[in-house]
Structures are given as structure tokens and as C-alpha cells.
């Protein structure tokens, strides 16, 4: 692209009928200094052969704001200089020829207050299908404080949840009921009771258990809450079960949520696939009814896993904090699901910090002030077991729910023993950490010492102690070498 093609055309020539380059229409400005009130998006773009990266960046800015493929005179009926998004920086992606990071600034006036649906319609609504790009990925966003303040965020937050549970200074423990499909309501409730009695704080529904022929949702709720109440009475601890209210319509979701509330549940769950409007709607219901909202990120891997195209999960986490969820599955790094340890830590930081600093090794490109929005409790779930407790505590600290589904239900001595093994492993590791021991390196030794007086933990370590999922992550930082969790 020649120099003129990168320069904005001014005056009458700008609005003559015809086709101009996006940069010529004003969607590229290398001298632009973003305002504090601008929303900034960072895209990873792979232009088609022969497409200049600056023109590709300008096209992203144009197609995600006000542009179309040709000049339209009706631009002059608007404050078009203000409304145009502006690509202002393009950097080659380190070590990846043909890919570029492009920074695009959007004036805040382009977005409806408090609406993730509107935000996503602009930022990801059109550009990902644009022919001049082989691929595009939304890597990160900076959300201005003025925009953050239009959202209400999590209905409960970490602090209030811990106060309700009376649990402080250590991770919470949970498990997903297995098998996730096929159990009758009564047997399902039995699994819930055994897990809670054995020492877990929560049990949960999985993403695809809704209301199938083998178990109506109402039956599941009744048996699960019976299990919760019985386990609470027996142990003297506050217990809970994440009742999945995901359904085909909002009306049905509200109906299930109301029934869960009537039964005394303190928490309900929805899947990410219900959509942004449904998430914000049920979040508002939870706020009005003093309920914790658990978010299962079902389906996210279809657009977050590939490094060259889609949306980074750190962006999804930011949107979900705005939308208002209390719990969010955010990866384990050491389990069976995709997750580079530093990258996953970046997701956790998005959930738990009041201000994110720039942290390129963890994938955070911008400072992000959360304007006192409540914190989200990250959830580590998927292929984890008691033998990894030292890794999990070292990676994620205290404010996390550690969910051992198969690592509880699959215990050779039974479900209650599986829960007890996880509880003892956690308590032993927290104690060792608080005594100043190096749990990252001494973890296996600490666990074996605890197992000498806990047969369930000994059995768990014997059967799963050497199980790991050390595959090369696909979504890693571009600024540091990838590491493994081992």
C-alpha cells in the first residue's frame, strides 16, 4: 500500500461516491492518543497475502464501528470523526510471521450502557468474516471506568460468599456429579449427599444436565436439596449444590430459579451458551433474590482455544465479570482441559483483582481498573485430583473453588472417601503453606505424610498420584516461552 493509501482524505474528496481504502476513510491514525474514556480492543490479525497490515487494521476498525465497503454521504449527517473507530498501532506478533497485533480505539458513545449484547455486536459482530483477513482474534480489551460503572457486576462476590459459608483462608472444595447423564433423581441426590458429608463445600450439576426423560429437573432439585440439608445438619457446615437452571426459554429459567429458591438453595447455575442477555437477566434475578450465580463456560472452546482466530478467554472473563457472575470456570492448568499455567493465571487475575496491571507473560496487555466491581470466584474443574493439590494451591492461591468430579466420584473406597481425601489433602497443604514450607516442591512429600493417617487419601494417591495431562498448550503467551504444569 503506497503512502497516499495510508493517509486520510479530507474535505469534499472524502465523500465523493466511490470506493476508498479504509485508511483513507479515516480508520487509521498512527498519531492518535487514546483517551481515558476510549474502549481499546487488541486484535491479532492475519491479513491475506498482499494486504497491507495497516489497511487490514483500518478495516477492522471500520467494520467494527461505522464503515461499509463504499463511501456513503450520510456519514456527513453524523459526528463521523468522533464515531469512527481508530486503529492507531500495528505490531508484528513475536515469532509468528504474517500475524500482527492491531490496537483499535472506540469512543464510548458508540456503546449502549450496561449491555454486553451491544458491545459484542460491534466488536465481534462482523469483522471475523471479513475477506481481507485470513483470521482474526480478539486478544484483550481495556474497558474504561466510565463504561464499567454502567454494569452492576457479580450479585454476591467473593467476600459475601465466604461470609455466608464461614470459610476463610483456603480454597473451597466441590465436585461435579458423575456420570453427568443417566442417573435417576434419587441416585443423583445420594451422590450429592455422600460428597457433601465427606467434606466438600459444594456439589454441582454438569453443563448438560437439564430436564431429560431419565430425570426431570424438579425431581433433581428436590433430591439435591434434601441431600444438602441432611449433609449440613450432619456436618454442622454450610453446604450447597449448584442447581443448573439452563433451559430453552427465559421464562423456564426463571421458573426453575424460583423453585430452587423456594427449596432453600443459595446458588443456581447457568451455562455460557444461554447468551449474554440471558446471563445479565438471570444475574439481576440473583441480585434481587440473594442468590449466588455459578457460570459454567460450556462451549467456550469453540472460539477461545485456537490462537489465530476467535476470542481469548481473558476477554470472555472480562465480559462475564461485567455481566455479573459470582463463579466462573477459568481453567486448571494441570487438569485435562486446555490451559497454559501463566495464561490461566491471567484469567484468574481478571476475575479476582480490583485493578489488573499490564502482565504480558500472563496475556494482559492493558491496565484494567474494575471501579470497585465485585470479584468473581474462579473455578478449577476438569481432570484434577488430590495428588495435584500442591500445584493447584501454588498456582491459584485461596480464592478459588477446586472441583474434583472424577477425583471424588471415582475413588476406590466410595464417594464419601473421595471427598474426604480431597478435604484432607487441602487442609494438609494449607497448613504446610502457612508454616512456611515450599509446597510447590515439597507437595508430594506433604501429601504422603498426611496419607499415613488418612486411608482415603492414601488410596487416592496410589491410584491417581502419577496421573497428569502434560500436552502442549495451544493458547500461550507470545512474550515468554511456554511452560508446563509439571
Swiss-Prot record:
UniProt keywords, alphabetically: Calvin cycle, Carbon dioxide fixation, Lyase, Magnesium, Metal-binding, Monooxygenase, Oxidoreductase, Plasmid
Matching SUPFAM superfamilies: RuBisCo, C-terminal domain, RuBisCO, large subunit, small (N-terminal) domain
The reaction(s) this protein catalyses: 2 (2R)-3-phosphoglycerate + 2 H(+) = D-ribulose 1,5-bisphosphate + CO2 + H2O; D-ribulose 1,5-bisphosphate + O2 = 2-phosphoglycolate + (2R)-3-phosphoglycerate + 2 H(+)
EC number(s) on file: 4.1.1.39
Keyword Lyase: yes
Binding-site positions, Mg(2+): 204, 206-207
Site feature location: Transition state stabilizer: 336
HAMAP family linked: RuBisCO_L_type1
Role according to the record: RuBisCO catalyzes two reactions: the carboxylation of D-ribulose 1,5-bisphosphate, the primary event in carbon dioxide fixation, as well as the oxidative fragmentation of the pentose substrate. Both reactions occur simultaneously and in competition at the same active site.
Summary of subunit composition and partner proteins: Heterohexadecamer of 8 large chains and 8 small chains.
Further comment found in the protein's record: The basic functional RuBisCO is composed of a large chain homodimer in a 'head-to-tail' conformation. In form I RuBisCO this homodimer is arranged in a barrel-like tetramer with the small subunits forming a tetrameric 'cap' on each end of the 'barrel'.
Record-stated family: Belongs to the RuBisCO large chain family. Type I subfamily.
PANTHER family (alphabetical): RIBULOSE BISPHOSPHATE CARBOXYLASE, RIBULOSE BISPHOSPHATE CARBOXYLASE LARGE CHAIN
The name this protein goes by in its record: Ribulose bisphosphate carboxylase large chain
Originating organism: Rhizobium meliloti (strain 1021) (Ensifer meliloti)
Taxonomic lineage: Bacteria, Pseudomonadati, Pseudomonadota, Alphaproteobacteria, Hyphomicrobiales
Gene it is expressed from: cbbL
